[in-house]
Amino acid sequence: ALNLYQAGAAKKILITGDHGQIQYDEIKAMRQWLLKHGVSAQVIYADHAGFSTYDSAYRAEAIFSVQRAIVVTQPYHLPRALYDCQSRGIEVWGVGAAGNAYSGQTARNLREYLARTKEVAWVVSGQKPTYLGPKISLDGPASATDG
């Protein structure tokens, strides 16, 4: 995401993740990393209720009115993220995040298979995300999403 932003491919960054508990905050880690690498807080928007990839894609369209996006995530996770965004009518491109190799990839692959099956069922059934809420404009201040 940082490289795409620095290259001018994206003017704003929507970070999305689980922040359902005070002691568990995926958003904080992502925001701090982006800030540390020179991204202005004014372009970092946060969705604190991205409890699943499905929730993140659904909320990106329903809450933040995203119509076009570049999704950056782990390569093994990218097909599901693209599917979820496309199911919401988002014109989407995907980029596999560069990163370290971690042990346990076999277990993550199994989890990914199960998650894909679940999310296809959610798309077909019209499942709502865990939380919806009022619209948030990506043309407004990013600080409105600080949570």
Q: Where do the PLM segments sit?
A:
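Short linear elements at protein peripheries
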Residues: 127-147
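A structural signal for short, hydrophobic/glycine-enriched beta-strand patches
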Residues: 1-110
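A transmembrane-helix-recognition feature enriched in membrane-embedded lipid enzymes
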Residues: 109-131
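A general structural signal for short secondary-structure boundary/capping elements
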Residues: 93, 115-122, 138-144
